[in-house]
């Protein structure tokens, strides 16, 4: 994972969480392209949990019920479920409240992603049960690493003629 050292280094909040294997519900707040979705997937994989994903733009309570059914089945087999909700700020108060009993019971660990300030967009009852982590925009060097990895994975080689800097 590239960037976000202020969260991921061994002595930083998410780094400690992964080292201690003590996952908690959280909000990942940052600009588009800062790695919110990728980080959620990595956290889930590191913790050995089942990953479910929802988009608050496209889905609602009906889909949440389906996810909760899956989570109950996994829980019966002693496997935890991480529910990643992209654009969580798009859910209304009632939809956000629907997460509360399931976070409190431990059925799901919620990781919400938002580009908006959670203090204004996430209702206080839900926000009080989540830790908020601020992701920073990737800098030029970090974007270069990401771009080079993507190009290498596709066996594309750019000559050192400034083409990469135009991509970034």
Regions found by a protein language model. Give the residues of each.
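Conserved catalytic/switch belt of AAA+ P-loop NTPases
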Residues: 16-19, 85, 89-128
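Conserved AAA+ ATPase "SRH/arginine-finger" region at the nucleotide-binding site
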Residues: 55-57, 131-144
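Short glycine-rich substrate-engagement loop in P-loop NTPases that contacts/grips substrate
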Residues: 6-12, 49-82, 93
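Walker A/P-loop
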Residues: 16-54, 69-72, 100-101, 105
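Short conserved motifs of the RecA-like P-loop NTPase core
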Residues: 157-168
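A short hydrophobic beta-strand->loop->alpha-helix junction that borders the nucleotide-binding pocket
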Residues: 30-31, 52-60, 114-115, 135
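Short loop/turn elements that form and flank the Walker-type P-loop nucleotide-binding site
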Residues: 8, 20-24, 46-48, 76-81, ...
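A short, basic N-terminal segment
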Residues: 2-20
């Amino acid at each position: 994972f590239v960037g976000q050292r202020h969260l991921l280094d061994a002595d930083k909040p998410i780094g400690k969480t992964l080292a201690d294997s003590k996952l908690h519900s959280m909000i990942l707040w940052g600009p588009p392209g800062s790695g919110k979705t990728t980080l959620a997937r990595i956290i889930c994989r590191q913790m050995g949990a089942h990953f479910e994903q929802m988009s608050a733009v496209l889905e609602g309570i009906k889909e949440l019920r389906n996810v909760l059914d899956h989570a109950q089945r996994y829980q019966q087999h002693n496997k935890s479920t991480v529910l990643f909700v992209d654009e969580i700020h798009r859910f209304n108060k009632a939809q956000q409240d629907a997460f509360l009993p399931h976070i409190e019971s431990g059925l799901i660990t919620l990781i919400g992603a938002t580009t908006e300030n959670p203090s204004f967009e996430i209702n206080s009852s839900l926000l009080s049960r989540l830790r908020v982590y601020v992701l920073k925009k990737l800098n030029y060097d970090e974007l270069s690493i990401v771009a080079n990895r993507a190009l290498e994975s596709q066996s594309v080689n750019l000559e050192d003629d400034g083409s990469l800097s135009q991509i970034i």
